């Protein structure tokens, strides 16, 4: 089994990465492979709602970062963890630009696979950013993996998050819970839930 972790921080080895590595280390100890993709400081194209992904099977803007995620999902992932620093009470905008494209073009390949979000902040806004990231999972029938608390940790300068003992424990618990869910789903014999044909409601006729 394999879990993809996306580091949504421009600092490739900052606090968000440290939190994700704590999750990954726990997953590895549970015999689950992991891969971390960092967005770094790359400029990220946002979705322009052109609809071409529906025809191509991938976003028409095939930049290196999107391609890395696309390739990882196509090669097969069993779970997804998204990490972000908190900016003005929300996730990093570059990360959201990437996720909009990923979930619109590849969301069908992530259905019924466990997802989790991780946020790191200096002081406040973590729960709002956490909620924002979880919305990606809830539009794609993805079970959300929880921990002993909301998946957040605190730190300002790089490395400080390691001193947040509760935050790091929350990350380890998240890793164990993700592993537990993956293993249970792997042995499930009843397949996926029954789905209805999607119905859309527009509020203006």
Regions found by a protein language model. Name each.
Residues 143-205:
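Glycine-rich phosphate/pyrophosphate-binding loop and the adjoining helix
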């Amino acid at each position: 089994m394999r879990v993809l972790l996306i580091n949504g921080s421009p600092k490739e080895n900052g606090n968000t990465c440290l939190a994700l590595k704590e999750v990954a280390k726990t997953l590895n100890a549970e015999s689950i492979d992991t891969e971390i993709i960092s967005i770094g400081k790359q400029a990220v194209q946002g979705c322009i709602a052109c609809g071409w992904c529906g025809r191509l099977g991938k976003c028409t803007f095939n930049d290196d970062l999107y391609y890395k995620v696309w390739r990882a999902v196509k090669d097969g992932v069993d779970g997804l963890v998204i990490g972000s620093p908190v900016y003005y009470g929300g996730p990093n905008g570059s990360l959201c630009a990437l996720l909009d494209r990923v979930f619109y073009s590849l969301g069908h390949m992530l259905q019924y696979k466990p997802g989790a979000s991780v946020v790191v902040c200096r002081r406040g806004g973590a729960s709002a950013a956490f909620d924002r990231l979880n919305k990606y999972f809830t539009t794609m029938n993805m079970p959300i993996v929880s921990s002993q608390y909301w998946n957040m940790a605190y730190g300002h300068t790089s490395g400080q998050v390691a001193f947040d003992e509760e935050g790091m424990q929350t990350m380890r618990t998240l890793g164990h819970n993700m592993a537990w869910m993956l293993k249970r789903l792997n042995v499930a014999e009843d397949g996926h839930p029954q789905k209805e044909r999607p119905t859309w409601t527009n509020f203006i006729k």
